Design a protein with these regions (language model features):
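Short, cationic low-complexity segments
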Residues: 157-169
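Secondary-structure transition/hinge residues
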Residues: 20, 24, 72, 88-91, ...
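Acyl-donor binding region in acyl/amide transferases
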Residues: 6, 30, 36-37, 49-139
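Short amphipathic alpha-helix that is part of the acyltransferase structural core
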Residues: 1-26
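Conserved beta-hairpin
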Residues: 16, 29-46
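C-terminal "cap" of GNAT-fold acetyltransferases
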Residues: 124-160
Length: 169
């Protein structure tokens, strides 16, 4: 039977380097979780951090930046579910992740995540700032899970109130 325990970024990145098909280890994180069996062997790891997009509020949204497994059955679903529970306990309103358009997302769906959008993909490289591309640049599928609906509703009400005040209502 698999269980989830917290882990360090160093341990998580070592496993990402071994198992992840197309991304290198990460630089920063908020938390990382390890999926182990009854004798303590690791079968998967998830690293959760700030959203990559600057347009998304890093204090309200957590983002799964890496999830890697050795192929053990249900490890992905277990880790996605555990990451959402930890992010909820930390007070985040939602959690999100992006997967390749060639991946099914069945583990995310099994963990209660919902498909939200298709991103354009692309690269962070620009003429003014060339960057070496290491990851696939094709379209990505965005999945999210709402964690603290009351907090999300409160934020929406505050935004609506600010809009009414702006127009003198």
């Amino acid at each position: 039977m698999l269980q989830v325990i917290p882990t360090t970024l160093d341990v998580a990145n070592d496993l990402v380097a071994q198992w992840h098909r197309h991304h290198p280890p990460v630089v920063g994180y908020r938390f990382a979780l390890l999926c182990i069996d009854e004798i303590g062997l690791p079968h998967g790891v998830v690293i959760v951090g700030r959203p990559v997009s600057r347009m998304i509020d890093q204090y309200r949204v957590a983002e799964v930046s890496r999830l890697a497994t050795d192929g053990h059955k249900n490890a992905c679903s277990i880790l996605y579910g555990a990451a959402a529970r930890v992010a909820k306990a930390m007070g985040f309103q939602s959690i999100q992740t992006y997967i390749l358009d060639s991946e099914s997302g069945v583990s995310l769906k099994a963990s209660g995540w919902q498909f939200k959008a298709i991103s354009d993909g692309g690269t962070w490289s620009r003429e003014q700032r060339e960057r070496k591309q290491k990851a696939p640049t094709n379209q990505k599928l965005k999945f999210t899970k709402t964690l603290n609906q009351k907090a999300a509703d409160l934020v929406l009400r505050k935004k609506e109130k600010a809009q009414f005040e702006l127009f003198g209502c």
